[in-house]
From Swiss-Prot:
Keywords: Glycolysis, Isomerase, Manganese, Metal-binding
Superkingdom: Bacteria
Name this protein carries in UniProt: 2,3-bisphosphoglycerate-independent phosphoglycerate mutase
Cofactor(s) annotated in UniProt: Mn(2+)
Cofactor-binding details, from the entry: Binds 2 manganese ions per subunit.
UniProt cross-references to CDD domains, sorted A to Z: iPGM
InterPro entries from the UniProt entry: Alkaline_phosphatase_core_sf, BPG-indep_PGM_N, Metalloenzyme, PGAM_B_sf, Pgm_bpd_ind
Residues the entry annotates as binding Mn(2+) 1: D398, H402, H457
PANTHER family, per database record: 2,3-BISPHOSPHOGLYCERATE-INDEPENDENT PHOSPHOGLYCERATE MUTASE
Subunit comment: Monomer.
Residues annotated as catalytic: S65 (phosphoserine intermediate)
Pfam families: iPGM_N (PF06415), Metalloenzyme (PF01676)
GO molecular function: manganese ion binding; phosphoglycerate mutase activity
Length: 533
């Protein structure tokens, strides 16, 4: 007997598509988006919060893709690593952190150097410079004789030239605490690649590991010289400015807390079977990462991962239902690893498909990215008729928005809008329901108040639109579904469970965005478990 095809819930995450009524510097407002505009007019919609305490960050802190997908998938507000580590610095408990104290002892016993590696930024997305200050306090208390700082500059989650302020603050703190020196400087474009562009990573790695006394400049001089040549923080070419090579017997603390852009450089240091580029592994080398970048890495972890249970993917799997995730390279980890609460392995019945991002230096050169291929992949999954939940991420608004180039970002937005129209046709034919939303803002605010380019995320809310399939009514809510106006990302998973008529576990503390209504239900839809993959 042939089983009826499943009418799926399709969650579409428009990465970096925020909401802002101001039109100046707003690539979304400037773009032609007939699909999104018609959906906003015709279907239930609301705005939801994606920053600050609504996603487990400090008040006023902008959200990001990792935090956004983690909250969406968990169905609860997840306290973020930024808060956990900042609290440890503020209350002094970082000074007694067992992994950090141990590496200091090992370095001291071997008479080695302690290397502090990470993004020197106040962005709070991958790191925070106050965490580096806490490590300098630790090194002083542990009587480390030589502390070498390998500064990575931001310019992506901060203004393009904010790095000089961060580096100046770091120099001031070094003078205050009386320990440490900046020995290398590298833009995150090189040191924090996540797309296996190993030639970039190698340039940062070589500067850190090859012998040399440096050119004697101060770090702020390096930045000023780069700015004069039109090269901003993100793209600072790796350079050594003082002695302090990573050598056998040394220790490294990588103080980024976000894993995705920290894995590759870490692999270059510690993976015995590393093949990204030719290098001689440094042994012995003590290595601590602030958080768990990858469970397969041979490192110590200062702040162990939080254990999240009964997240959305797990609930779907435990019900015997199938699910599908797809995104292009830039956001694939977000719809898989982060969406699943930091778990690498898929749940039972969870299929995934990676679409390769175009190999370009920056995405303003290819604003369409791989959105068409992502759409094709999603439609093919819908047509299989076996998935109860399909999760899709369109990377364009965020990745092109980060370049600060408005015209290419407009093209990126328009590409996504066209793809969305085609995707919705596929969902409609399958009788499915689509939730369209975003993980954080970006492309809606690309100029600051002074008219300068803004390349970071925003604290703006994001849209959420609920699109029911034709002749398919959400059980219990009837034809005139309304959405709450005070929602947050943690409410999306309960909303999906509500639509699928699945029980919400107690660990999932978000609330469905669907407003109860007193209507006659014309046609209910119950998901049908299908054991085909």
């Amino acid at each position: 007997m042939t089983k009826a095809p499943v009418a799926p819930v399709v969650l579409v995450i428009l990465d970096g598509w925020g909401y802002c009524e101001e039109t100046r510097g707003n690539a979304i407002a400037a773009a032609k988006t007939p699909v999104m505009e018609s959906l906003w007019t015709a279907y239930p919609h609301t705005l939801i919060h994606t920053s600050g305490k609504a996603v487990g960050l400090p008040e006023g802190q902008m959200g990001n893709s990792e935090v956004g997908h983690l909250n969406i998938g968990a169905g609860r507000v997840v306290p973020q690593e930024l808060v956990r580590i900042s609290d440890a610095v503020e209350d002094g408990s970082i000074l007694s952190n067992s992994a950090l104290v141990k590496i200091c002892q090992e370095v001291r016993n071997r008479n080695g150097k302690l290397h502090l590696v990470g993004l020197c930024s106040e962005g709070g997305v991958h790191s925070h410079i106050t965490h580096l200050f806490g490590l300098l306090d630790l090194a002083k208390e542990q009587r480390i004789s030589e502390v070498c700082i390998h500064a990575i500059t931001d310019g992506r989650d901060t203004a393009p030239t904010d790095g000089i302020n961060a580096i100046s603050a770091l120099e001031d703190y070094i003078n205050h605490v009386g320990i440490g020196r900046i020995v290398t400087v590298s833009g995150r474009y090189y040191a924090m690649d996540r797309d296996r562009r190993w030639d970039r990573v190698q340039r940062a790695y070589d500067v850190m590991t090859q012998d040399g006394v440096g050119d004697g400049r101060k770090a702020v001089d390096v930045l000023q010289a780069s700015y004069a040549e039109g090269v901003n923080d993100e793209f600072i070419v790796p350079v050594r400015i003082a002695p302090g090579t990573v050598e056998p017997g040394d220790g490294v603390i990588f103080f980024n807390f976000r894993p995705d852009r920290s894995r590759q450089l870490t692999q270059a240091f510690v993976s015995p079977e590393f093949t990204g580029f030719a290098r001689q592994q440094i042994k012995p080398l003590s290595f601590v990462t602030f958080t768990q970048y990858d469970s397969d890495l041979s490192v110590s972890v200062a702040f162990e991962p939080q254990n999240l249970t009964n997240i959305l993917g797990e609930v779907i799997a435990n019900q015997g239902l199938n699910q599908f995730r797809t995104a292009e390279t830039e956001k694939y980890a977000h719809v898989t690893y982060f969406f699943n609460g930091g778990l690498e392995e898929p749940f039972a019945g969870e299929d995934r498909e990676l679409v390769s991002s175009p190999m370009v230096a920056t995405y303003d050169k290819a604003p369409a990215m791989s959105a068409t291929a992502v759409t094709d992949t999603a439609i093919a999954a819908i047509q299989k008729g076996i998935y109860s939940l399909i999760v899709i991420n369109y990377a364009n608004p965020d990745m092109v928005g980060h370049t600060g180039q408005i015209e290419p970002t407009i093209k990126a937005i328009e590409t996504v809008d066209r793809c969305l129209g085609r995707l919705l046709e596929g969902v409609s034919k399958a009788g499915g329901t689509t939730i369209i939303t975003a993980d954080h803002g970006n492309a809606e605010y690309m100029l600051d108040e002074a008219g300068n380019s803004w390349t970071a995320h925003t604290t703006n809310p994001v849209p959420l639109i609920l699109v029911e399939g034709e002749k398919v009514k959400i059980p219990g809510y009837g034809t005139n579904v309304e959405l709450r106006s005070d929602g947050k990302l943690a409410d999306i998973a309960p909303t999906i469970l509500d639509i699928l008529q699945l029980p919400q576990p107690p660990e999932m503390t978000g609330r469905s965005l669907l407003q109860p209504a007193e209507y006659e239900v014309e046609l209910s839809r119950t998901p049908i478990p299908v054991g085909l993959n």
